[in-house]
Amino acid sequence: LFRSKQGLTNYWGYNTLNFFTPHAAYATREAQFGGTGAVLREFKGMVKLLHEAGLEVILDVVYNHTAEEGLGGPTTSLRGIDNKNYYRQTPDGAYVDVTGCGNSVNTATPAAQRLILDSLRYWANDLQVDGFRFDLAATLGRDAANEFQPEHPLLLAILDDPQLESVTMIAEPWDVGMGGWQVGKFPDGWSEWNDGYRDRMRDFWLTDIGAARANGSAPNGIGSLARRLAGSAHVFSQERGPMASLNFVTAHDGFTMADLTAYNSKHNLGNGENNRDGTDNNHSFNHGVEGPTTKKDIVDSRRKAMR
């Protein structure tokens, strides 16, 4: 509703109504016609088949906000149960938004902590998923004053819960609020997306090549690449080690791999934000032409870079 009021329609499935049900639209048509029970059975069957194929299932979970529009809009989620306990608010009752989605779940309260833990236990034990990737996880570690705390009770409780002992926990270690970038700050036992690794890999394989073509030399060199490949020890403590870093190059946010090799700048012109949304710092290189092209040498260079 927060997005639809702005005239936007594509929310990527990240405006959660509740924390305990699969999104029915992702199920087969047959399961949808069969109702919620059929959707749930199909999800369980999917997990079972993936396990039989030797694949673990990591569930992307959004506990940092819900689909509530705001105080002036209809009640769609936790506000109808306990608005004060479940949402971060200013003294006058306005929602504190450190997520960019209109509200933030107040994980400083025991009620919100219990709800999230119950949800994790349900997905891990009843539905047998193997791990979780936590969207905007820095929000989950904010205290009553909205400050991030590495030893936040919820972050520790997730690790200490005996029902979640063997479950993988992966943090997207930032949000859009003040002090939101917390890479390397989560407790031992958490893995974190390493955006420094992402950017350095893009530089080495893309922007350095572009700079070398234009200027005859690459600005970054191999030293910082080696540091990232060795585990980003300058970011993650010795106690946590390199396994705390989840290295990646692209994700659902921002440029795809194809975009990285085809655009020097973002062109988000079709979603009503006038190209303001998304970062301008994409560490990309178009290989000589901005956007799609049929030139064979450029197409070949882009494919090689993606590989």
Regions found by a protein language model. Name each.
Residues F2-Q128, L136-Q163, V167, G179-G180, ...:
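Substrate-binding/active-site clefts of carbohydrate-active enzymes
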Residues Q128, A144, Q149-R307:
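Conserved alpha/beta catalytic core and glycan-binding cleft of carbohydrate-active enzymes
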